Swiss-Prot record:
Pfam families: PAPS_reduct (PF01507)
Gene Ontology terms: biological process: cysteine biosynthetic process; hydrogen sulfide biosynthetic process; sulfate assimilation, phosphoadenylyl sulfate reduction by phosphoadenylyl-sulfate reductase (thioredoxin)
Note on how the cofactor is bound: Binds 1 [4Fe-4S] cluster per subunit.
InterPro entries given in the database record: APS_reductase, PAPS/APS_Rdtase, PAPS_reduct_dom, Rossmann-like_a/b/a_fold
GO cellular component: cytoplasm
Active site residues according to the UniProt entry: 256 (nucleophile)
Chief site of localization: cytoplasm
Protein's name according to its UniProt entry: Adenosine 5'-phosphosulfate reductase
Keyword Glycoprotein (UniProt): no
Molecular-function GO terms, alphabetical: 4 iron, 4 sulfur cluster binding; adenylyl-sulfate reductase (thioredoxin) activity; metal ion binding; phosphoadenylyl-sulfate reductase (thioredoxin) activity
Cleaved signal peptide residues: none
Enzyme class: oxidoreductase
Amino acid sequence: MPPFATIPATERNSAAQHQDPSPMSQPFDLPALASSLADKSPQDILKAAFEHFGDELWISFSGAEDVVLVDMAWKLNRNVKVFSLDTGRLHPETYRFIDQVREHYGIAIDVLSPDPRLLEPLVKEKGLFSFYRDGHGECCGIRKIEPLKRKLAGVRAWATGQRRDQSPGTRSQVAVLEIDGAFSTPEKPLYKFNPLSSMTSEEVWGYIRMLELPYNSLHERGYISIGCEPCTRPVLPNQHEREGRWWWEEATHKECGLHAGNLISKA
């Protein structure tokens, strides 16, 4: 049995609650900690994240396979902080799934929304589907990046469900721990944990099925990588999962900007 699948589903409600330690008062050696975590299980990586940042660690949940990240974090800390982006263009199935996860774990999910002062002029000037003509950058910038930037401005550390196998072009070098190259500032470094980075899609789904976790029903219809409804479609059996996102654009540009550090580090 792999190290990331050690907690039976029957123990979900009986596991002892984790008490958050206080965040570290002194900076840690980032390269040393990253190196020590490189071969650890996702649970060990999350445990280290909670040990160093306590209640200042936030979990990012996209309404897709990263329910695995939420499950692992919740089992370590029943008061885990989770946020999710509502772009206003998600599938109905994704909205229902976010509520299902909220109810399943009994947690609050901080749902982030676009700033209407930015969104309304875009829609008024260019309509609802300008991304098919102009590319997805402008729309994602308003619907995703700005709300996330606003959220992360008050956060010291966050954890994402990024995996290396999700995109050979932009995520193959995702580290388990890094300084976020997209949202850090010289005055305020933002620490980013990627506990699932070494897991494969098969391992993620093995975890979901073994523990009978809730999942987005779109997965049953051929959707693997799930984003906004107009920009996501099912993939064929031999296609990579990212081919279902922004299919009208060049393959190497298929990042919305939430993890722009992946592109910055490759520049």
